[in-house]
Regions:
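Non-catalytic nucleic-acid substrate-recognition regions in nucleic-acid-modifying enzymes
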Residues: 2-117
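Hydrophobic, well-ordered secondary-structure segments
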Residues: 90, 94, 98, 118, ...
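Short, glycine/acidic-rich beta->alpha junctions
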Residues: 113, 153, 176
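Short acidic-glycine loop/turn motifs at beta-strand connectors
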Residues: 124-126
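SAM-dependent Rossmann-like transferase core, predominantly class I methyltransferases
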Residues: 130-166
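Conserved class I S-adenosyl-L-methionine
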Residues: 169-176
């Protein structure tokens, strides 16, 4: 990639690369075509909510969320899976993480008054990717523009389209 990281996998709407904390920061700042940057905590297979609970509970959440961390399942999506209720998936995943952190931190209750750790769950054909969202708002809303107008496409899509052309930074680009 342009940032110097090796791409591990390319799937529909998702590019996976390995990196450290600095790589996450750099990706959030410099990637022009990404909507968000996430840290994959795990991939789990589940066709029942009990299987989902146990699989999520088995992940190493203590490596990502500190004892005072504020965490919630910001979004759950499901396509062609037996588990089809996003709200139920959100509830089960949150409960499983709480149970895991109770065991790891020897706590019965969490204040959740520290840094925020939004979680996203993507189910496809009974396999879920569980990830921490490091971007917050979509990256096309990075906030460097004070006054914006409605555009027919997002900045990230526009950047991708330009990258497919022979244009380079030494040439003038006009956005009519």
């Amino acid at each position: 990639t342009d940032l110097g990281y090796d791409i591990v996998q390319v799937e529909d709407g998702r590019v996976t690369f390995e990196g450290d904390a600095l790589a996450v920061c750099r990706a959030n700042v410099f990637l022009r075509t990404a909507e968000r940057v996430m840290i994959q905590v795990g991939r789990v297979k589940a066709t029942t909510y009990d299987q989902l609970f146990e699989a999520v509970k088995a992940l190493d959440w203590q490596k990502f969320i500190p004892v005072d961390g504020k965490f919630w399942v910001k979004k759950a999506g499901t396509v062609k899976s037996k588990l089809f209720s996003p709200s139920d998936i959100q509830r089960i995943v949150k409960k499983a993480i709480v149970e895991k952190l109770k065991m790891e931190y020897h706590e019965s209750w969490f204040a959740e008054d520290g840094a925020e750790y939004p979680i996203r769950v993507f189910f496809y054909k009974d396999e879920a990717i569980i990830a921490l969202d490091t971007s917050g708002e979509s990256l096309h809303k990075r906030g460097y523009r004070k006054n914006t107008s409605k555009a027919p496409i997002s900045e990230t899509l526009a950047a991708a389209l330009i990258m497919l052309t022979p244009w380079n930074k030494d040439r003038i680009l006009v956005d009519p």
